[in-house]
From Swiss-Prot:
Keyword set, alphabetical order: Cell cycle, Cell division, GTP-binding, Magnesium, Metal-binding, Nucleotide-binding, Septation
Name the UniProt record assigns to this protein: Probable GTP-binding protein EngB
Top-rank lineage group of the source organism: Bacteria
Family: Belongs to the TRAFAC class TrmE-Era-EngA-EngB-Septin-like GTPase superfamily. EngB GTPase family.
Record bears the keyword GTP-binding: yes
UniProt GO molecular function: GTP binding; metal ion binding
Record GO biological process: division septum assembly
InterPro entries with a match to the protein in the record: G_ENGB_dom, GTP-bd, GTP-bd_ribosome_bio_YsxC, P-loop_NTPase
Gene: engB
Organism placement in taxonomy: Bacteria, Pseudomonadati, Campylobacterota, Epsilonproteobacteria, Campylobacterales
Binding annotation for GTP: 29-36, 56-60, 81-84, 151-154, 174-176
Xref: CDD domains: YihA_EngB
The protein's role, per its UniProt record: Necessary for normal cell division and for the maintenance of normal septation.
NCBIfam families attached to this UniProt entry: GTPase_YsxC
Domain EngB-type G: 21-195
Length: 199
């Protein structure tokens, strides 16, 4: 389980990132999908990661040190809140630099062991998410894994939820508002981080 967490540092590129010490978990998805809010819910601290209703607000790579426990063992993880893909009120030049820095960070940061791809459950097949999935698959290593998480589950009815999960067998459906699916995701993160595999 996650005990608590604290903000470490913000970085705009890999050179500014802290030296990797612990296993890292990267949260990524399109803008305004709820990455910061999910990190806050998982860490039981609504003020930890700064979330905003304005798409593209998170323009830096933010690192959080997370204290965890499984049985009697305590350990630390690093959660990484990444800038949202696909939307930002910035110039084309700034966006190009930003995308280059993100690409370099994701491909070269070998301490990232788990990618959590967040998708708005109401819009499951957008090109940006399909492309992000293909992008991750293009470089993900044998010692890395990917979890698909559908957010904003409270916006769906029961039949919509069932249909979504039926089409995406290994995905997890969460709602920050209702706190549903959070425990399941938390357990999955802990197990994967420790090298366990539930399947």
């Amino acid at each position: 389980m996650i005990l608590n967490a604290k903000f470490l540092i913000s970085a705009s590129k890999i050179d500014e990132a802290p030296q990797p010490i612990y296993t890292e978990i990267a949260f990524l998805g399109r803008s305004n999908v709820g990455k910061s809010s999910l990190i806050n819910t998982l860490c039981k601290n609504k003020n930890l990661a700064k979330s905003s209703s304005t798409p593209g607000k998170t323009q830096l790579i933010n690192f959080f040190e997370v204290d965890c426990k499984k049985d009697e063992d305590k350990f630390k993880l690093i959660f990484i809140d990444l800038p949202g893909f696909g939307y930002a009120k910035v110039s084309k030049k700034t966006k190009a630099i930003w995308n280059k820095n993100l690409d370099e960070f994701l491909k070269e940061r070998s301490s990232i062991k788990l990618f959590i791809h967040l998708i708005d459950s109401r819009h499951e097949n957008l090109d940006i998410d399909l492309n992000l999935d293909l992008y991750l698959d293009s470089f993900i290593r044998a010692d890395q894994k990917k979890i698909t998480v559908f957010t904003k589950a409270d916006k769906l009815n029961q039949s919509q939820k069932a249909k979504l999960l039926n089409a995406n067998k290994n995905a997890i459906l969460v709602s920050n508002l209702k706190k549903s699916g959070i425990d399941k995701l938390e357990q999955k993160i802990i197990l994967e981080s420790l090298g366990f595999n539930e399947e």
